[in-house]
Curated annotation (Swiss-Prot):
The gene is Lman1l. Gene3D superfamilies: 2.60.120.200. This is Protein ERGIC-53-like. Keywords: Disulfide bond, Glycoprotein, Lectin, Membrane, Signal, Transmembrane, Transmembrane helix. It comes from Mus musculus. InterPro entries: ConA-like_dom_sf, Intracellular_Lectin-GPT, Lectin_leg. GO terms for cellular component: endoplasmic reticulum-Golgi intermediate compartment membrane.
Amino acid sequence: MLEIRGLSPSLCLLSLLLVLHGAERSQPPPRRRFEYKLSFKGPRLAVPGAGIPFWSHHGDAILGLEEVRLVPSMKNRSGAVWSNISVSFPSWEVEMQMRVTGPGRRGAQGVAMWYTKDRAQVGSVVEELASWDGIGIYFDSSTSDVQDSPVIRVLASDGHDLQEQSGDGNVRELGSCHRDFRNRPFPFRARVTYWRQRLRVSLSGGLTPKDPEEVCVDVEPLFLAPGGFFGVSAATGTLAADDHDVLSFLTFSLREPGPEETPQPFMEKDQLLLARKLEELKARLALGTREASIPPLNPKAQEEGERFFNLEDTLGRQSQILQALQALSRQMAQAEKHWKQQLGSTVQVRPEGGWNTAKVSTLLYGQRTLIQALQEMREAAARMASGAHVFYLPVGTKHHFFELDHILSLLQKDLRGLVKKTAKAPRPSGWLLGSSTCLHTSIFLFFLLLQTVGFFCYVNFSRQELDKRLQEYLSTGSLSLEPALPITRTIGVLRRQPISPSMQA
């Protein structure tokens, strides 16, 4: 039998740690549930005029559609957002994305994420945490040492401390790590998980969109009672100022892993729904309600049936009207014939005492008026009968083609009449159809050239006459009694004439 002696304590401790780590990794992860009332993210992060749903903002915080700017890049500013609803579950996980940008290597006071018993309003100064009952993850960028800045610290106040409480009542630092979260090309992500009295803070660098997370602080055992509030705050100092933006704050409740609920197939859900409806129908039939027993008619089919019955009623009424109008027309014809017979008999029979002229004329006028009215009524009845008969005929019969033929013949007659009127209209001699009344270009240029030649001939002739008169004036010294020459033209001619010897003397 092989016997092992001299096993060192360090090896035993290492093996124990490996066993514990393997057992921890073998445990299934907790079940997560998204809590929308404790979360916010873009786009449309804030409702215009109403703020963030289920959250309140304080101080210099500026709400946008994509992010919450806790503090702008101005000195001595502070702002915060706090949840209006408390945390009702014992274990939770928060995923936060933020961006801190500003000039220089040294930043402002930084950003702090809180889980406290009571809600505060503004500020991220560490000294104020002593009066709070909670913890805070403090992203500090105000350290004077550039090499050690920025730093992430996990702080706790009275009531939420380690089980081995020191009793001094001051702020305790549970852990810290150095990560540069200022001026990153992508948002800086932080994951805070509280599960089974263990707090873990994991960070991503923000150099790429999917940087791997690294554990910054892992503290246990730590007891955090439910009923607290989440908050995020930031502040700037007197020396430097950064823009502090929170892009998203997502909260998840954690529960013990259990047997997964197998979702029912879609067909089973349909069967259950149909079975429930069948039971409801049976219950209604048992009560004897007629409305439930008679299935409702299809509204579209019902509308079509009503339309069909209405059409039949209309056609029946129109046929009755047609028959009544035809009978009325026959009665009118008989009445007209009877009145004509009576009128002829009254003309032939003459009383012994003679006719009264006024009475006879009045009687004849009344008879003519009555006959005319009867004729008009007969024509109106005939028109109504023909209209009703046409309406009664079904669509697609030959009478439509007869009507179209009649309309086309009328249009042809109108067009022929217009053509005849146009042909009979008087036209000037030499008029051609389609000829234009505008002047041709060649004729216009010919007259323009003729006018130009005449103008130049007139100017040349006038100039020769003027030169001739001036020569006579210079030779004789006397000017004929002609109309006075224009002074400007005379001076121009004199300038062009040479000086004679007599004028020089």
